[in-house]
Amino acid sequence: MPPLSITVVFPMFNEEAYVERAVNAARDVLGRTAHDFEIVVVDDASTDGTGPLADRLARADPRVRVVHNPVNLKLGGALRAGYAAATKDLVFYTDADLPIDLAELPRAVRLLEYQQADIVAAYRHDRTSEGWLRTVYTFAYNHLIRILFGLKVRDVNFAFKLFRRSVLHRFPLRSSGSFIDAEFLLRARKHGCPIIQIGLDYFPRTRGLSTLASFGVIAEMLREMAENWKDLR
């Protein structure tokens, strides 16, 4: 496997309870496995202490960078800002609450290189610990994406995407909301990027609130899905 050059992107909105833990965990794993890495924290106009905490971590370590969105751009805008800031060969995105064990990242990199893929998208072995409502919502969303677009990815919105940065040069991303994950995978498929999947253990958040299953987020996802249907199917 070639020397590992990787950017880790953490989109964050009001994640002061997690920001230091997330950065330290990424730095620990990458410090043992990567020859060249950076950690990009996207502060999506947080109203708590996320931004100042991230800035303090960046001042202490030049490998940590912070992108401050002047207004809240939601997940799509935060990820687009983080991806635009990435400079390394590979890009990895996950959530600040670390829904996965970051020690799995080197395995994903090995699979990416061994199978000569462009993207690794992970799926959760078991997500019932989140409760029945989120479980049903995710099941329905994944099947809707499969029916409308024919995308055979088991866990479209799971926050574990590893990919070659060169993929970002092949197409623009336009979504502002949580449809960004589906858009990324669909545009990648349309441009012939090989996608592989791996199963991971899942650790639901214990602090703060997830807004992914809120009515407003779901409505925005459905709107963007409808707008992009002809282009992405």
Regions found by a protein language model. Give the residues of each.
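A conserved acidic beta->alpha catalytic loop
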Residues: 43-52, 98
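N-proximal low-complexity "stem/linker" segments adjacent to membrane-targeting elements
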Residues: 1-28
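Acidic helix N-cap motif at the loop->helix transition within catalytic regions
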Residues: 17-21, 48-57
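Conserved donor nucleotide-binding strand/loop of the catalytic core
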Residues: 37-40, 51-85
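Catalytic donor-sugar/metal-binding loop of nucleotide-sugar-dependent glycosyltransferases
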Residues: 152, 173-176, 185-203
